[in-house]
Every structure is written in C-alpha cells, then in structure tokens.
Amino acid sequence: MPEGFPAGLVLIDKPAGISSFSAISRLRSVYGKKLGHAGTLDPFATGLLLVLTGRATRLASYLVGADKTYDATIQFGSRSTTEDPEGEIETSGVTTTEEAVRDALPELTGEIDQVPPAASAIHIDGERAYRRFRRGETVTVPTRRVLVHSFTLIHFDSDSQQATVSVRCGSGTYVRSLARDLGDLVGTGAYLTQLRRTEVGAFSVTDAMPPDTIAAAAAGACAWFPASTAVGGLQQRQLTAEERIIVGHGGRIAVDSNWVDDVALLDDMGDLIAIAAVDDGVAAPKIVLVPA
C-alpha cells in the first residue's frame, strides 16, 4: 500500500462503457495492488462503486448486503435480450401512459419474486449465467425473493415512451428485471436504457470521484475513507493501550455483557483495529486489520 493510505474505503464514480474491474484496476497506482469491492455495476451503468484497500478487503461482507439506490431510465414499447441497451432490441410498437405506469409500480414494490436476467453473474450449475447466455444456450434463472423499498416514477415522456424512475432496493435486486417486469405489466415490453447507482448504504456518489481523476491527479485522499466507515453500523468499543496489544495478537477482551453480534474495536485515534464476535461479554477477534 502506498505511503499515506492504510486500509480503507474508496468511493468511485464509475463512468459508462467500462467494466467495474477495469475501473478498479486504474486505482492500483494510488492505493496499491490489494483492492476489493462491495458489488459491481454493469458496463453500461454509472455511479457508485465501493472499493476496499489493503486489509480492509476483508470487510466486504459488511457492505455487500447494504441497501442501494438507483436512478434509471426505462424505454417502453421495446424489449432487449439482455434487458439493457447492450442486447438485441425488438420493438413491439405498443404504447402506454403515465397513469398505467404509476398504477403498475405498487406491484413491483415490497417483497417480490424476481427472475434475474439471463445475462447476469448468477451461478447456474457452477457457471456464471452470462457465459451460458453468450454461448447461445437457453438459460433458466431461478426466481428469488427480493426487497424493493421504493419504486418511484419521476417523469414520463409520452412521445419517447421513456420513464425516469428512482429505485431503492435490497441487495440482490436487479433493476434491469424491474424494468422488464414493469413493461410486461403495462403490456408494452420495456428495457433499461440508463442506470446510475447513487447510494450504497450510508455512502453517496456525491462523495465519489471518477477513477481516472483519482489516478491522474493523485487525488487519492479526496476519495479515501478510513476502514471504520465501512462498519459504521456495528457497535463500537475503544481499546485501552493494553487491550490494543491483546487484540493485535488475536486475543480476547471483555465487553458489555448486553452486546450481541459483532463489534468494531477502535484505538484511541478512532482507527479500526479489528472486528470481533461477541458472546457472553467476551469479544473474540475475527478480522484483525492492524496486528500488534
């Protein structure tokens, strides 16, 4: 890890037209080779990517399941084989109305059953679904339960048959599939033409920077956040100097007997030292970011 950037979190504003992995790889000159992520975006999509650096890559599981918020544009009257602009487009010629779209949205809100796209990263018999799809195979993706907190119509243009929407959803929800299903509900077919992720948990794209800007300007500090921000939802415990050494060696310490689940253990500067599992008033380190 380059000097000045310990384990932490980087917020990328991914541009359209590149893969998430390509965007992340452009940061290695700034943050070092050990980089991880907390969920990718499709190449056509833009917006917030959470990138973990150094030992903080071990914190990905605390971020992957966070709720996400998107702005999206949906094209009605057509269908796409990939449910986005990168697939083969078939036009139905059928139109819809703003009222019909608004009336259909509640059916795709709350806990719903969703069939993810065939061109997705879901594993089917040990292989990514999109690999089978690209080979021309018929891909049957199983239905799964997802949570859509809100699906809001921002604007509908009757001439272009395009709708701008905002979606806040739980992890594992495909906005592409929401667009497809909305098109089916109004009887026109539909696919996603634009997608921008604006929030992941407590993190916002307004605090992110494009990867090339970070790399070219050596502006790493502007987009870097300490590892403690990745686990801001956990209980926190500040360590004494003696406890800091014990935890750094993987040893256990006493904590509040009423605590359950995991706890973030911090030093006197607020830096994250470890994540520990708590049982009966004892915290046992499971991830040590800063060894003694």
List each language-model region with its residue ranges.
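Active-site phosphate-binding and catalytic loops of NTP-dependent enzymes
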Residues: 33-38, 111-117
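The conserved catalytic core of RNA pseudouridine synthases
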Residues: 26-32, 49-50, 138-172, 176-177, ...
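Structural signature of FAD isoalloxazine-binding scaffolds in flavoprotein oxidoreductases
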Residues: 61-76, 139-153
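Glycine/acidic-rich beta-strand-loop module
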Residues: 34-64, 131
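Acidic, low-complexity central loop/insert segments
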Residues: 62-116
